[in-house]
Structure formats: C-alpha cells, structure tokens
C-alpha cells in the first residue's frame, strides 16, 4: 500500500512538472500566434489601402472626428458601403493616429515596411519559441525526476 502511494505521488509530481513546462512552452507559442494575427491584419490593411482609397479617406477623417460616415453593425463597420471588419477599422485608426496627413502611396510603403518587420519578428519568435519550449519542457521534466528521486 505504501509503495503504491509512492508511485502515485511520483506520477503526480512528474505530471505536474510536465504540465508546468508545457504551460510555459505554450506561452511562447501564443506569442507567435499573436504576431501572426497582427501580420494578417496588416496584410488586410494593405489591401484596404490599395483597393478602397475613398473608404480609407473616410475612416481617416472619422478618426479625427471630422466625418460621421462610420457605422458599426453586427461586428462589421460600414463606410460608404464598404464592409470592413471592426478589428481592421481599429487597426486603421491606430495606424492613422500616427499620421499628420493622408497620402495613400506613402502609407502603402509604410505598411509594406511594417509587414516586413513583422515577418522578421515572427521568424525570430518562432525560433525563440522552439528553443524555449524545449528548454522549459526538459527542465521541468528533470525537476520532476529530481523531486521523485528525492522522495524515493
């Protein structure tokens, strides 16, 4: 009976240490997913700037309170009959907040630069996540084994 309880205790220690390491590894992977989501939003922003200049100008004006043609319905935003996702509109507003004047050609160049920087960040974050995940999983498992040996 005592031996069985020791085995169960050791199993719980190993499992909990593994789950702790797995949780830390998952945090790194979530950072990569967040960067990928931001990059996808940036690419959609680039499409909007390229294909809907009139709507973009309206959103730009609405960011500064000089235009009321922006209306939210069912999680989407309608600007002069153009359907944009609400999160994309927020991205646009954040992007336009840094601008003084609207010049769509230079904004496309800015978006391209930002997109390239995000790609580099994603690549480095993926490498960091892979390395850190292995380290956290290995270390947590070794700690679990160490504690288990100490209990025995």
Question: How would you label these PLM feature ranges?
Answer:
Residues 37, 44, 91, 110-113, ...:
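Charged, amphipathic alpha-helical oligomerization/scaffolding segments
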Residues 76-105:
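Short, non-transmembrane cytosolic segments of multipass membrane proteins
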Residues 56-59, 88, 107:
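Amphipathic alpha-helical interface surfaces
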Residues 10-16, 20, 126-152:
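Bilayer-spanning, highly hydrophobic alpha-helical transmembrane segments
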Residues 46-49, 67, 71, 96, ...:
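A structural signal for well-ordered alpha-helices, especially hydrophobic packing surfaces
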Residues 101-143:
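Membrane-interface, cytosolic juxtamembrane amphipathic helix immediately N-terminal to a transmembrane helix
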Residues 2-74:
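Juxtamembrane/interface alpha-helical elements of multi-pass membrane proteins
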Residues 63, 78-88, 132-138:
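Short alpha-helical linear motifs
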